[in-house]
Each structure stands twice: as structure tokens, then as C-alpha cells.
Amino acid sequence: MSEEQDPLLAGLGETSGDNHTQQSHEQQPEQPQETEEHHEEEPSRVDPEQEAHNKALNQFKRKLLEHRRYDDQLKQRRQNIRDLEKLYDKTENDIKALQSIGQLIGEVMKELSEEKYIVKASSGPRYIVGVRNSVDRSKLKKGVRVTLDITTLTIMRILPRETDPLVYNMTSFEQGEITFDGIGGLTEQIRELREVIELPLKNPEIFQRVGIKPPKGVLLYGPPGTGKTLLAKAVAATIGANFIFSPASGIVDKYIGESARIIREMFAYAKEHEPCIIFMDEVDAIGGRRFSEGTSADREIQRTLMELLTQMDGFDNLGQTKIIMATNRPDTLDPALLRPGRLDRKVEIPLPNEAGRLEIFKIHTAKVKKTGEFDFEAAVKMSDGFNGADIRNCATEAGFFAIRDDRDHINPDDLMKAVRKVAEVKKLEGTIEYQKL
């Protein structure tokens, strides 16, 4: 700490200056009136007592500054000691880890007493084992993974639940900044979806008060590009719950039983991290109708579907886990999957009407630089049969027309040319007739 920053030194300096000024005034003799005849200058006098006082004060300042410096050094040394202690502890733990032998992994089967448990080792045998004193007994429930000492088989620590890497990667889905305000033409569908998913998670007491059971899940079906996946993303971003994004095709595995195991792991992870939403896109990959004939691969898909049905039946009605499924082929789904009690609500996501297309045009061109008066009504009339993805593509194509003309904005003519171009491409697409489920 410098002398200017130290309030004590500053105070001492002010006191010294005041004393010196006072002594000077006290010692200054009365000046005689000067006359023209005689003027005599007296030599300045130095008070020995004042000189000793100033000397002692300066010495005290030096000692105080030295004390401050030593105090800062002491603090730095203590911080260094704490850092070295942390490094020492880490090194000790590393040495112990290198010198210690491995431990077995087991699963708690039953509690016999506070100190004795039946544990199933990973190799298969079951043992009655003790517990280390530092282990929390209240967490030793049935099915909990623990480590066992390789010699005494004592429970050493509790392990987290084993999660399949494939299931864990499903939880790292990027939700983005999608909101319901960015989805146009689906007001009624958004209301139905939020009633089934959001309302039971945020206000479950409403259903208890009325005396009804909230639905377990919802099926979104309709033509491609109408916003089914977008709705699920908006739900996840709005509620703030844990979200598992699982394309149904990614669940299918070539080894027998692996697909069903992934389904079990996924639902177990969801129950442990409630509130949680499971979104299965293109569910027709595993939810197709079952039939007696078929290859071994078809039978494996049917076993996966049966495991999915079993897990959905095991849900608590007022639990904090909800499921959303999406497909553009609802006619191929198995009736057992569609029955009430599993997917209680089916929401059709149709092609947008004129009002919906107008709203979608405004949403997708909101952030685009524009010049001139845009007549969206003309674009809406020309875009009959377009879905939301087609309208977004119109905004992109209009931007390309502006780039070709070396402009940094689009004009109404660019948008009309883009609509005509997308309409020409739409002729190549087939159509599927959808009926309400």
C-alpha cells in the first residue's frame, strides 16, 4: 500500500503539517514596524524539539510502510501455502489411486439391516456385505449401483445410474430460441399441444381439482413440412424441462434386444430427470402395424414396439414425464400405439390456409432486408398448397435473386419470382391423403 493510499499515513502527514504550522506561528516574534532609518534581518531559528518530533514521525512512517509491505508478503505466502496444500492433496490422491487396487461393481438387491445388504456383483453371484461408514445409508435403495472392495466386498461408494451413450447424446439436443410466436397458422394446434404437455407439468393440481387424469402423450401427424418438429422444439424451449430428442430410426439396432434396451434406458433416464419430455420423430419407423410374417429384422422392430408400449403403460398419470410422437404416415401405425391411455390426443398439423400462409410469410420475411411495398396477398394466392417449409424456401429464393443482382435487400418482384420457382418444384412432389384419426 503506497503512502498516498494509506489513510493512517495521510493523517499523520496532515497532523505533522498542522503542528509545524502552529509551532511556526507560536515562535514567530512580533515584527517591529519598519522605519526608513533602520532595518535589521534576524536569522531563522530551528526548534530542537520540533526537529526531534519530525524525525520520530518520519521514522514511524518508514516502519509503518515496512509493516504494510511485510503484511502483503505474509498474505501472499499464506496463499501460496494454500495452493501448495491443494496440490499436495491432489498428488496424494493420485498416488493412492495408482497404488490402490480396483473395485467391483455391484447392484443393491435388498436391505437386511442398516449394516447388511444383499448385493449382486457384476459377475453374477450375490453376497451379503457390509457398508463403509462414510456411505449414506439413505441412498442405498434397490437397484442402486455401488462399488465393492475386491477383498472384503464392503460397499465403498455409490455410483450414478448407468446411462447408455446413445441415450445421453439424445439429451444434448440444441433447442435454439424457437417460440410459439415464430410458428404461424397453427393457433388451435398449439393450444391442444400445450394443454396436453405444458399444463400437466406446470399446474397438475388443476386436473386433481377437476377429477380427471391428464393425457400421457400426444401424436402430431400431417404432411411433411407443416411444423410438427418445430412445435416440439417450441414446447421444449418454452417449458424449460429436460428434453430427449429421439429419432425413431436411431433406436433400431441390428442386435437382438438392443433396441428394446435403448427404449428402457431412455424412459428410465426421463423418470430420473423429471420434468422431462420425450420427442420421438418419424415414429412410424418402429410403430408400424405388426404382422405374423416377416424377416428377423421385422420381428426385432416389433419387439421394440412392444417394449415401447410397455414403458408407456408404466407411466404415472400425474408424473412429470410426457411423450410427443410425430409422423407423416399415421395410417401405418399400429392400433395398440394409438389407443387412448397411451397416445390420448392426436393433433393433425394440416397445410396452412390463406390466413396461415400470410402469417408464415410475414414471419419468415421479418428479418429480411426489404424495400418497397410488399403485397403478401398476391403471394398467398399463388402459394396454394404450400407448407411452412415451402414458404420459408420462398424467402430464401428471394434472397438469392437479390444476391444475383448485387443487392443487399429484396423487393416485391424477387418474392413473386421466388413463389413461382417454388411452385414449379412443387409439381414434382406426390400427394398423400390424410384422414383424421
Curated annotation (Swiss-Prot):
Signal peptide: none annotated. The keyword Nucleotidyltransferase does not apply. Residues 1-51 are annotated as: Disordered. N-acetylated by NAT1. Residues 20-32 have a biased composition (Low complexity). ATP binds at residues 222-229. Residues 35-51 have a biased composition (Basic and acidic residues). Belongs to the AAA ATPase family. It comes from Saccharomyces cerevisiae (strain ATCC 204508 / S288c) (Baker's yeast). The gene is RPT4. The modification N-acetylserine is found at residue 2. One of its GO terms (biological process) is nucleotide-excision repair. GO terms for molecular function: ATP binding; ATP hydrolysis activity; proteasome-activating activity; protein domain specific binding; ubiquitin protein ligase binding. Keywords: Acetylation, ATP-binding, Nucleotide-binding, Proteasome. GO terms for cellular component: nucleus; proteasome complex; proteasome regulatory particle, base subcomplex. This is 26S proteasome subunit RPT4. InterPro entries: 26S_Proteasome_ATPase (IPR050221), AAA+_ATPase (IPR003593), AAA_lid_3 (IPR041569), ATPase_AAA_core (IPR003959), ATPase_AAA_CS (IPR003960), NA-bd_OB-fold (IPR012340), P-loop_NTPase (IPR027417), Prot_ATP_ID_OB_2nd (IPR032501). The 26S proteasome is involved in the ATP-dependent degradation of ubiquitinated proteins. The regulatory (or ATPase) complex confers ATP dependency and substrate specificity to the 26S complex.
